[in-house]
Amino acid sequence: MLCDSSESVSFSSISKEEDTPIARLLKNAKETPDHRFISVYNERGIVAKYTYTELLRRVNTIAKFCDDLGLGKTVGIHMGHELDFLCSIFALWATGRTCVIFNQIWSQQVVRVLVKRLNISDLLYHEYKPKFEVDTLNATSLASLPLDIDAPCIRAGLEPEVALINHSSGSTGVPKSMPFLMKKYALGYDYGTPEFMNHLSTPMVMATSFALTTLSWINALYCNGNLLYPSSSISATCTSEAERLAWNVYYALRAGCERLIILPNLLVLTLQIMPDKEECFPACKLVAAGGEMVPANMYHTCKRVLPNATIYPQYGTTESGLVSFLAYNGKDTLHNKELVYFPGKTVKKLMLVTEDNEAVPEKIGCEGFVCVVTDVQSEPYVGDDAETIQSRNSTFINYDGQPAVRFADLAVWNSYKGKLGITIKGRLGRRVKRNGVFFDLKYFDQVVVGLKEVKDAFSFFIFNRFVLVYVPAYNGVDPVTLKQKLNKELRDHHLFSSCFPLADIPRNAAGKVDLKSIETYASKCLSVEDQRLPVLLNPVAIEISKIASKILQNPSLEGKDAPLYSCGLDSIHSVRFFHAIQSHFHLEGPIRYNMNSNCTPNSIASIIQKKSYNVSSITYELLNEDACALSRTIPKLSILPTNGQYFLLTGATGYFGRRFLEYLVKLNISVVCLVRESSDEAAKERLISLVPSLRISSENIIVWAAHVEEIRFGLDDAKWEFLVENVSRIYHMAAEVHWMKSYQELRPANVLGTKTVLELSVMGPKALYFISGGGQQEVELDDDTQSAKASGYALSKYVAELLCRKISDLGHPLIYVIRPGFIIANDGEILSRDFFWRFVATALRMGIWPQSDESQSLVFHISTTDALCMTLTQILEKEADAYAPLLAYDKFDGDEFACICESMKNVKLDFVTLEDWLKALEKDVDEKGEDHPLFALQHATKFALKSSMTPSNGLRNIYPLSETFLTKEAIANGLENLYIE
């Protein structure tokens, strides 16, 4: 029977801790008995409804049944989204019992462990009969339990101290058990985020044991919301469980759901399976997407289908209980903006901490593990096995005498609209650090699975190498070809060292992917591969292999003739490697510039023994011959009619390129952008993700996938002819910037790419503006000594400029070569690999600032993005001189720069000579190692800082000198965002 309305129950008089879910259910049944709390839907719409009155009757029935059976104190529930799922939980709580929600994918082994660990005596089920059998577990079906309208009404006050024992996913073995106290539900029922609009109707589409599921039904109960349950009879042809869930979401939207609390990837999958791509659901008011990383295009993909929905990326953990974070800048996810999460009001203290649980400074860019102090967290893990104890000690910590939860996720302090929050960087295990740079293995996995040759895949970082384990999509997939295709997709020909096929992905006892077994398999395959390498006999080569083995931390390379770049010798390790070789063999020449990407210990030994290391294999004469030979293949100047409607822009995704594109769009100029991607659609998505203001919705902006190193950029005949007929001006900015690669390695992109641009420019002719790098050496190579000292990047730019000169000499009237200085953004964005800001950060951290050897101020050649945009579009239109490279930078006083740094960063800088500063830098790099900002660029630092003293040889500077205020603005904005350790 229902509660007697004559009973003197005053719900308003109870304390907040006493306002348990049972008390709230009774309150709702009394005050709003006809409120529809649960609705069941299928593909035809709502097929059943249950009010609080009907819900309470079923709860009373199950509660009497539980007492009659004499169930134990801890009871398992093995159910899907069905009426008896919630009714059983309420009934068990009302009779003083703790609930454990069983996951349907748990194996017999996992169930045995959990039953023993938690002393579970009984299990309730209804539609879904358990597939496991445990001798000590009594399974009881509620399917045949009829409604008993005479069953006594439950009452509050008998609830157990522990309400639910939640569980982790179990991805590393047996799931961890987390008790959650009954009293905490009333303290944080809205998870501290009332923006969730808990009164809205919400479908239950994810696993019943999932933390977001508990969030949904608890806050719906406390806020008089409405739950939508998918009928088990929904008819849909599905190839996977994920697709079945996606159909459940789709039919919930058709049934009029107002809110989705959902996994991001499930939401995206739902939009993909929709039969009518033009269909939209204006009834949906809110989407909270959490539980996994948010795809960059989620907001914009959803906005058309859910036009009236507020879309929040959501973040939290099962361990933190009723704590939730929201990212209010979710709409910026496609605009190269990092999501910034803010905690709800249940968080008393938010910190980022080190592995030793020391708080990191609350400054933008500081990294640590997310840690919260709150009154509504779960209790520490239950269990006495070694792994549980270790996890418990590292997760549930004490901070200033208060219990706290340390998440497994790394994050950095960030800000949005002036408020400090956190940006999630991912789990430590799937996020690896190489040379001070973090790589997301999960991102690599997603890229690989997108290839047609791969069914499933996981990447690993072993012995400083990225390796892939994959399940082929069909027979005959060649691992070598797959590696080449993957590296091309990732735009780094040596990123992945090896690909190893696997028949199927192994699963652990919890049904999750067994990453440990896969990584062990990858390590064994890699070891076998290393053992097959040729054995070295040359003593010099053997010594070189020992050096490589030590630097790459891979003992198996010792004595083997291994291709070093494929074994993890990237740009930063190569600095240490070649420096070690020069020290070991007492060499004086710049041996690193003699190396190519296929170098091995034997090939390096050959160079050393021939004593050819001090003369570059690329001579001044060869560079000129290369330029002459290439220029002869470029067609002669031709006068062609052209519509001249478009500008062509290469390098639009670059640091300056994307800002220049924004500038052109503001001027209402039509632009064709060539973007390095696999398809036009991928090129558009990438460009939109980088250029916030860009909307590719008209013919004014055309985006094509292209590769500058390929013939005609890899475009088909129709696209090439379009460029010939419709482009009047070309801005060529695309380049491969790499300070350690040789000329031959950079020639395809930087030289042949410029050749293709010139081939297009002679058709018309079309005005060509070639932006030749930024801040690199301004030297005219006139002897082999200079060519031996120059980097491969500088050599490639030299030949590209030489090509432009030769075509200009043949009569092309509209070729401009522009040499900027160090390019810095007026909006303050700092490029992590940018030399200039690395130098500034180093100087501030060391507390000393360089001057010239005569104690005079250094001069920095700086080009701000705003001023450079004006230069390229306005000033150059007035230039009519004969061909000569044009300088485009502001000469900014170094001492004035130092004063700005002191003021904005509140530090005191001592001035020293450049030579003394470089000595201090060498010591600083030795102490900090490869994490030092200038580790990889130490060899180029002196030249870069002295570049202002290089004579300009009469070259004209066309930079708007009246715009010095823009330089100061860019410096100030950059310093605002610069993090100093």
From Swiss-Prot:
Against Pfam families, the record matches this protein to: AMP-binding (PF00501), NAD_binding_4 (PF07993)
| Native source species | Schizosaccharomyces pombe (strain 972 / ATCC 24843) (Fission yeast)
Q: Which UniProt keywords apply?
A: Ligase, Phosphopantetheine, Phosphoprotein
Which domain of life does this protein belong to? Eukaryota
Q: Which residues form the Carrier domain?
A: 535-612
**Protein name per its UniProtKB record:** Uncharacterized protein C162.02c
Q: Name one GO cellular component term.
A: cytosol
Residues with PTM O-(pantetheine 4'-phosphoryl)serine: S571
The entry's family comment says: Belongs to the ATP-dependent AMP-binding enzyme family.
Gene3D superfamilies hit by this protein: N-terminal domain of ligase-like, NAD(P)-binding Rossmann-like Domain
Give the molecular function GO annotations.
Answer: catalytic activity; ligase activity
